[in-house]
């Protein structure tokens, strides 16, 4: 017999989902901090455009961090909440000393690839256990990353920074 949590989901499957969400949380925290560093330190001919875009991205990332942590709590888990835990858990690595706009964009693109893969895993598991709430939280993130990737392609074409 299955044991259900307060929102009617299988407790064991919910724990697995919490682990995935905590992994995503850790990756978003490192992504957020990288974005802050890029925002503060970017230099070059595209400074103004990149500086503003990086701020937009880090403001968005920190909102996602809070929403993911709240979803972990809803699933009766404990969100990771120390930087050392984030560093240990995250696949996204801390980036330091980067001021070149091209390199910043390349790092962001790589990080977005990691995030979208992790979001796909969460969406699949949430669908499997009937967790519509987690799907409602994560699906918009997934769609936003697709839009960001498209905007990045347009930016690269317009500025020719990778050619």
Protein language model annotation of sequence segments:
Residues 25, 32, 39, 58, ...:
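A structural signal for well-ordered alpha-helices, especially hydrophobic packing surfaces
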Residues 47, 79, 83-87, 109, ...:
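Long, contiguous binding/interaction regions
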Residues 9-16, 30-56, 118-134:
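Helix-loop segments that flank and shape redox-cofactor active sites
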Residues 15-25, 29, 55-58, 62, ...:
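Short amphipathic alpha-helical segments with heptad-repeat character
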Residues 2-24, 101:
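Disorder-to-helix initiation segments
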Residues 63, 136-163:
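Short, contiguous alpha-helical
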Residues 42-84, 155:
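Conserved alpha-helical segments that form or flank metal/cofactor-binding pockets of metalloenzymes
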Residues 66, 70, 87-140:
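Acidic/histidine-rich alpha-helical segments that form the ligand environment
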């Amino acid at each position: 017999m299955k044991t259900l949590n307060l929102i009617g989901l299988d407790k064991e499957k919910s724990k697995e989902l919490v682990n995935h969400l905590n992994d995503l949380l850790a990756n978003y925290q490192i992504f957020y901090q990288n974005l802050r560093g890029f925002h503060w330190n970017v230099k070059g001919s595209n400074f103004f455009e990149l500086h503003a875009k990086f701020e937009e991205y880090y403001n968005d990332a920190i909102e996602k961090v809070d929403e993911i942590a709240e979803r972990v709590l809803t699933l009766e888990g404990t969100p990771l909440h120390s930087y050392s835990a984030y560093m240990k858990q995250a696949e996204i690595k801390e980036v330091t000393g980067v001021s070149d706009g091209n390199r910043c964009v390349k790092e962001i693109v790589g990080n977005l690839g990691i995030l979208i893969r992790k979001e796909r895993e969460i969406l699949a598991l949430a669908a499997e256990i009937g967790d519509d709430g987690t799907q409602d939280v994560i699906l918009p993130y997934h769609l936003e990353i697709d839009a960001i990737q498209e905007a990045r392609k347009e930016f690269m074409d317009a500025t020719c920074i990778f050619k």
